[in-house]
Amino acid sequence: MNKVLVIAGPTAVGKTEISIEIARRINGEIICMDSRQIYSHLIIGTATPDEETKKLVPHHLYGSVDPRTHFTAFDYKKLAEKKIGEVLNRGNTPVLVGGTGLYLDALRKGFLNVKSDYGLRTYLRKLETNNPGVLRKILVDLDPQRAQKIHPNDLKRIIRAIEIYVITGIKMGEIVKENRQDENSFDYHIIVLDRERQELHERINKRVHQMIDEGLIEEVRNLLSLGYSTTLNALNTIGYKEVVQYLYGKIDFNEMVHQIKVNTRNYARRQIIYFRKIEGAKWINLSKTSQEEVVDQILSEFI
């Protein structure tokens, strides 16, 4: 079975440095597994590897999607699997790097096993309680073919169909079809990098200041001047939405910096929680291990 190395972990943990060294040692080619670094024009705020870094080993899918595009995990799965196949055909090793757990689940499990969003389910049930029949109408609008196959009173299946569409952005019929056609035989070896909380928070805070020094505000200003709407998913993410508020005069500079730090720390916490649920992942605490030891440990696990 074709082996694929996955280097995952929360934002600012240090995935880039480790993955570069690993890729150099195993004839690896790095493939983006980050839902923000996949967009073009979003460089500083997403901590996308710079051009000098990309020259060290081949990088793929970074900046490959226009921010105006409605890009889903389903779209990512198709792009990433194609790229993985190309790398393997060259006799090299695919190294997936990033912190988007949903992308990893899409590759490993497809979408029939999309994790439940209990917050969303609770919200949908409240909608139905307050307005009986509304979820059926919502499903008809989102996925009319699926709605025809579910009894109007089967609230559980209606909620699940809506949930999958909201999470993935695709219809159930397309998911079933894709899963039937999915014949990839990739063997994913998953490494999750982590650090002690205080150290990770300090790295996040330092990165925020570094991004601002490197021109994050100007990057956002340029995106707006190019006509990119603030309602786009790409611009409604951490680091960008706060700068937009600052540029529009809704918050001052210090509050902008504070919000980016807090929101990034909370995001890192959610990433860690998500990765904790992935069975078979090998966790490595970078706070307790030198980079050289980490690289050797990963190589011994993978090779």
Curated annotation (Swiss-Prot):
Annotated segments matching region Interaction with substrate tRNA: 34-37
EC number: 2.5.1.75
Enzyme class: transferase
One matching Pfam family: IPPT
Binding residues annotated for substrate, in chain numbering: T11, A12, V13, G14, K15, T16
Positions bearing the site annotation: Interaction with substrate tRNA: T100
Binding-site residues for ATP, renumbered to this chain: G9, P10, T11, A12, V13, G14, K15, T16
Signal peptide start-end: none
Catalytic activity annotation: adenosine(37) in tRNA + dimethylallyl diphosphate = N(6)-dimethylallyladenosine(37) in tRNA + diphosphate
MF term (GO), any: tRNA dimethylallyltransferase activity
Domain of life, source organism: Bacteria
Cofactor dependency: Mg(2+)
Keyword RNA-binding included in the entry's annotation: no
Keywords: ATP-binding, Magnesium, Nucleotide-binding, Transferase, tRNA processing
This protein's record includes keyword tRNA processing: yes
GO BP: any one term: tRNA modification
Subunit structure: Monomer.
Function: Catalyzes the transfer of a dimethylallyl group onto the adenine at position 37 in tRNAs that read codons beginning with uridine, leading to the formation of N6-(dimethylallyl)adenosine (i(6)A).
Similarity comment: Belongs to the IPP transferase family.
NCBIfam families documented for this protein: miaA
Protein name: tRNA dimethylallyltransferase
Organism: Petrotoga mobilis (strain DSM 10674 / SJ95)
Gene behind the chain: miaA
